[in-house]
Amino acid sequence: MQIELKRLQKKLKITFVYVTHDQEEAMTMSDRIAVMRAGKILQLGSPKEIYERPNCRFVADFIGESNIFHGKVEAVNDKLLDIATENGKLLSSGEGFLEGEDIFVSLRPEYLSLSKTALPGFDLRGRVKDFVYTGSVTKTSIEMADGSEVKMSRVEDNSEFKEGDTVYLSWDPPHSVPIHSSGEGEEEHET
């Protein structure tokens, strides 16, 4: 039905305003999405922009599944941020951040990688809690030292790891999204 409505909208060349709480429906049917909270638009953009580059923690948590790391910027090297968290160091890519700034980093589960040793710039270590095979992907839960849980969702089965193994987390820095923590970037947008 969603695809048929999208085809009809294109055929008739009219604008649809569609209100939904179903994220998959919004992503499937929309050219542009407005994520709202308390009557204010927090982010306006294409489904891809909203999903891959959330501008605040609320949007990162609201649209899809996201791992959120809280930390402090230790160094800024061009667009690469060295960030210290309670669970170790990580790298992210972003502009407009200052050394010493308190930030959040959003990472979608499909971008997370596991290894048996720490990779340069990363020393986030956790323990494999469990695996769930869903057919198309394997979902992995990793328990961090502070008790928080990080989610990974990959096509690969990670058969080299088993429950209870110590693993190191990493990702390609441009796949993570740094978010200012002061006000969490939740300014309203003009439409």
Segments from the language model and where they lie:
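ABC ATPase nucleotide-binding domains
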Residues: 1-58
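Solvent-exposed, non-membrane alpha-helical residues enriched in polar/charged side chains
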Residues: 6, 48-51, 60, 104, ...
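Elongated periplasmic alpha-helical coiled-coil
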Residues: 15, 23, 62-72
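Glycine-centered loop/turn positions within well-structured domains
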Residues: 24, 48, 57, 69, ...
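Short acidic/glycine-rich beta-turn/loop cap or linker motifs at sensory/regulatory domain boundaries
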Residues: 38, 74-75
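Residues located in well-ordered beta-strands
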Residues: 46, 58, 72, 125-127
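Short boundary/loop segments of OB/S1/cold-shock single-stranded nucleic-acid-binding domains
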Residues: 46-64, 109-120
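Non-catalytic connector elements of ABC transporters
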Residues: 66, 76-191
